[in-house]
Amino acid sequence: SSVGLEEAKLIASTNLCDAFGRTGIGGRKENQDNYTGMSVGNNVILTVCDGMGGMNGGQTASRIAVTEIAQTLAEFPIEELGENAIYKAVDAANAAIYRRALNDPPLRGMGTTATVLVLTPEAAYLTHVGDSRIYQLRKGKKEFRTFDHSKVFEMVAQNMMTEEQARQSSFSNIITRALGIRPKVDMVVEKIPYKKGDRFILCCDGIWNTLPEPEMMKLFLAKSATKEEVEYLTETVNGIGEQRGGDHDNLTAIVVDVKQKSTYQYGCLKLAGLAIKRQLARLGKGNGKSRNVKRS
């Protein structure tokens, strides 16, 4: 169903990739999601944020985040777009939301998730805060996925529940990291290779929490055009939400189709090191800080 969904938009198109985004209010009174995409030379910058907080706080937080991240990254020289640039951009967004909340009492406690993907000819650089996700698909199969900063996914990492149990848990809306809640935010920027024909998906929990991941992956088995794919994904999720009573969450997704191979590729030792690093990250071995934030 396309009820409550905005039109799918072409948000970036270069020799590297094409990216379309779409958002919808779902069954809520306001849409607290925001997304953005932009081209800087041949590079592409993409962000999806899912806000939280009453009195327009969630909307405000996610809007500040996508704006601040894009503006900060756009100020970097093209050759410097990478890990350091993303750290600085997300830090700037976190500080801007935190300051705004301090200066505007009705907005106190507002925050937002964030996913950031920067595609350069060398590699894909990405980070996430909270439970919005980035997927990398290759030939219809999952090549990579971010691991949610949430209470239930801490339990998944400790083998206390499966991912499907986590998805259906009544505690699935409690996240352990968000932008704007503290003066500083803990994050990890990853550098991963990509190949021609790969597809990246950035999405909020309103997308992935509606249907099991295997069902979501099936939607991408038929290699449709980028715009058709983001339309199909959002309309499928929206339709399921309507069938379940129509009080479903906001839903936002960006679909990216890659047109060439990155110059950076993994070696065997690098892959082994990454596997260990990811497992540590999943267990929360960042700076040891964790704070539960309940989302509406």
Language-model segments: residues:
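PP2C/PPM-type serine/threonine phosphatase catalytic domain
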Residues: 1-296
